[in-house]
From Swiss-Prot:
It comes from the Bacteria. This is Uridylate kinase. One of its GO terms (molecular function) is UMP kinase activity. It comes from Haemophilus influenzae (strain ATCC 51907 / DSM 11121 / KW20 / Rd). GO terms for cellular component: cytosol.
Length: 237
């Protein structure tokens, strides 16, 4: 088996990645597959942390456009990420993976409150750490959370799992001739106005030299290939 090129990773999973074909809620089969793939990394000696979005359950920004207070909507979105985190932790437990769920704000009796040093300690003990509730502040996306937590825990890379094979020069769903980039610099992403993640998250990663790899989580084995250095997805650094 190929050896991992990363010792510690931050895996960013969108809420939509957890949906079934009906486009709603959480598909247990998808969660179980992800848990098995994460378990494979842990068995290879990789320290794994996870940030989950909440868009499969709730989108605060969308309701804000309909008149809801944005702060209230974002708080509801943060709670949606906690629900996804609970589901992911349960799937990992059932796969015999020791996992810890942390929230950016206190949720006594449900999960631990985020603590930087405790998170690193658990990662060193080969426990999967799931970060939920975003940054704990409104107006920040879960992509920003992924980059922030990745920098804080000194991850080697942020792995952004999507439904496409990487970063393209245009939308591959609309243009079958869209070009897939294998390698990009931070400057190229900004100059070409490529949609990798929101600008706040991306500039945070750039300013701290955090590499980003974008790949298709829907491809079985893609996560392992990324971690072992196979040319999979798009690398930004």
């Amino acid at each position: 088996m190929s050896q991992p090129i990363y010792k510690r990773i931050l895996l960013k999973l969108s809420g939509e990645a957890l949906q079934g074909e009906d486009g709603l809620g959480i598909d247990p089969a998808i969660l179980d597959r992800m848990a098995v793939e994460i378990k494979e990394l842990v068995e290879m000696g990789v320290e794994v942390s996870v940030v989950l979005g909440g868009g499969n359950l709730f989108r605060g920004a969308k309701l804000a456009k309909a008149g809801m207070n944005r702060v209230v909507g974002d708080h509801m979105g943060m709670l949606a990420t906690v629900m996804n985190g609970l589901a992911m932790r349960d799937s990992l437990f059932r796969a015999d993976v020791n996992a810890k769920l942390m929230s950016a704000f206190q949720l006594n009796g449900i999960c631990d409150t985020y603590n930087w040093s405790e998170a690193i300690k658990m990662l060193r003990e080969k426990r999967v750490v799931i970060f939920s509730a975003g940054t704990g502040n409104p107006f920040f996306t879960t992509d920003s959370t992924a980059c922030l937590r990745g920098i804080e825990i000194e991850a080697d890379v942020v792995l952004k799992a999507t439904k496409v094979d990487g970063v393209y020069d245009c939308d591959p769903a609309k243009n079958p001739d869209a070009k897939l980039y294998k390698n990009l610099s931070y400057a190229e992403v900004i100059d070409k106005e490529l949609k990798v993640m929101d600008l706040s998250a991306f500039t945070l990663a750039r300013d701290h030299g955090m590499p980003i790899r974008v790949f298709n989580m829907g491809k079985p084995g893609a996560l392992r290939q990324v971690v072992t250095g196979t040319e999979e997805g798009t690398t930004i650094c």
